[in-house]
């Protein structure tokens, strides 16, 4: 069986087709979008989700390159294959720039397109040059112009919450995009991609008829790989991965789903796999955190700290669309940034209340976020040996040895420098929540309600359920006494598993576990 070639890091449709690399057919979406009543479209998706490839596919389509689409869905749908002049601007190279640098970068982008149309004396100002470029392409070709802008928001993402710098860059980009309104009669199609929506930009404030398809059911699967697409086009890959991992086909599909599936971009969205992680997994035949480790931005972690996001609150939540599918530069909560960046996704929708259920998409995101946040509680030493300690704890708990796991935790915390923020019990609750959540295959929750109070931590393993209560500068027996006094265990009597009660006491002077007591 010939090995399948994966287009990892390749975002050019023509190259993928000519080199016979794997291409997940999205051309039906292309036809649908280009043959409706709209002219201006915007799509928001997380990084490395196939936005650039979609833009490249649109470019090849509008350039009339019919031969590239043989065997794809659009071949049977399109009958004309009209060639249009296409202006393609990739803004991803405009990151980390001051205003003057950004102006020069826009100039370089325009210059590349101007050369194609023989414009030797460009006008001053990027917006004037874009107007001139559209006019020239329209007049010389005799056809309306297609404008494709990839990662329109890239120049502003890193300064989204630095008002002075953001205002300067936003004004520059507003001026650049303004011709998209003034030249409307000369435009056949305008498509912009990005990660987030920035308010007060011309594309949203001036293009009143722009169609935002980011949460449209009809386009929910336009980027990424659905389960149906994976099973139909990557069946052999699944079998090869299963063989390499010594798993059954069903176990392999379940593992892929747990790690990389779980994205939903509308109320009726199909399950969508992260394409970057899925392709890397098939290529390496290893289950790794490919997407998370490829570029989780520092500013995201910093913003989570700024908004005092408790790790335990990163899970299931309810929200209206206006609170997460919203501009991020003036946000008062972290939810829009987490959703639009791909760290939260839609898990459910209630038509009556119009409330969406949001949650972490999958295991890759959950583990990656918690590993990134744990150094906040452990003064940075986690990166050196915390992952090893947690893996060893996971093995011990799998064998029902909570005493051994807590002894190992005590030893590990003894190697961590003293942390100043250790004078409240909630700090330790969040730290233990992260650590227990990183243990392989267990369900962890905090502040679980019972008829007589709230349990600090509840952990469900394959063989038993742990009811855990914490104390600070007291003693473990007091923690266990609270579990028994308030009969917390009764709340879980019907879980079908043995229940183990654990009282843990922390010492604020050392930042470590002082003592613990375990009762079956």
What are these regions (language model features)?
Residues 432, 455-472, 486:
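Conserved catalytic cores of phosphodiester-cleaving nucleases, focusing on short active-site segments
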Residues 146, 464-466, 500:
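Structural motif
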Residues 176-183, 336-344, 433-437, 482-502:
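Metal-dependent nuclease catalytic cores in nucleic-acid-processing enzymes
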Residues 1-424, 440:
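Phosphate-binding site recognition
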Residues 491, 495-520:
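Domain-level recognition of nuclease-like catalytic cores that cleave nucleotide substrates
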Residues 166-171, 472-489:
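Mg2+/Mn2+-dependent nuclease catalytic core
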Residues 136-141, 435-462:
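Active-site metal-binding core of divalent-cation-utilizing nuclease and nuclease-like domains
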